[in-house]
Amino acid sequence: MFMEEKQNSQISLDFNQNIFKPSSREEIVEIVKNCYRKNIPLEINGLKSKNKIGRNFQSEKTLDLSDYKGVIDYKPEELYIKVRAGTPIKEIVEELDKNNQQLAFEPNDFGYLFSGESNSGSIGGVVSCNFAGSRRFKVGSVRDHILGFQGINGKGEIIKSGGTVVKNVTGYDLSKLISGSFGTLTILTELSIKVLPKPETSKTLVIKNPHLKKALDFLG
């Protein structure tokens, strides 16, 4: 089921609360603008699956993007999917499974380490951390699969870059810049991501060898 952005002519927000859970881009813009005008530190959260990584952020307000989710557009034949940043990884995987496709960079699943649930992170968090799995050696990291994005900077201004095709960039590729920026450059709102067919077969090998040279020789 694809989602459509709701355009609100009037936005009513309670700026006295400490945690904001917007469901539209317009609400996010107003929240950021208000915090910018009042010089209020704002913490950005998705599904909080990686909140235990790094030091605690000192903030007065929290922007919770867990409600800003959903598949916006998916074209299996054109090998791309467009989603909101708060969309859980598991929902994207389920959608791609219907057409035997995948996120080829294999997002790292730290759910069992931090939250106790598999695939508990959001796609925005994966891109912000640039976390890819072991297949990155063959297919590249997260940043190599981002076709385009929309985001909001610290002043509440909307930023757009790229599109939905591979060769669509002239000048500096901002999609690669925001990957791994941990939310410091923009609040991601939408992402267009390249998808690929699943392999017919796959295997996982565990090599138990304490000697680095022998392990490297085995990998050839």
Regions found by a protein language model. Give the residues of each.
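Active-site-proximal helix-loop elements at catalytic-domain edges
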Residues: 2-18, 89, 136-153
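A generic structural signal for ordered alpha-helices
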Residues: 6-13, 49, 70, 127, ...
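Short, functional N-terminal and low-complexity linear motifs
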Residues: 1-2, 58-64, 117, 182-188
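Glycine-rich N-terminal segment of FAD-binding domains in flavoprotein oxidoreductases
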Residues: 11-110
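Short amphipathic beta-strand starts and helix->beta connectors
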Residues: 2-7, 64-68, 187-192, 217
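Short, hydrophobic beta-strand segments that form beta-sheet elements in well-ordered domains
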Residues: 4-6, 42-44, 207
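FAD-binding subdomain of flavoenzyme oxidoreductases
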Residues: 105-106, 115-220
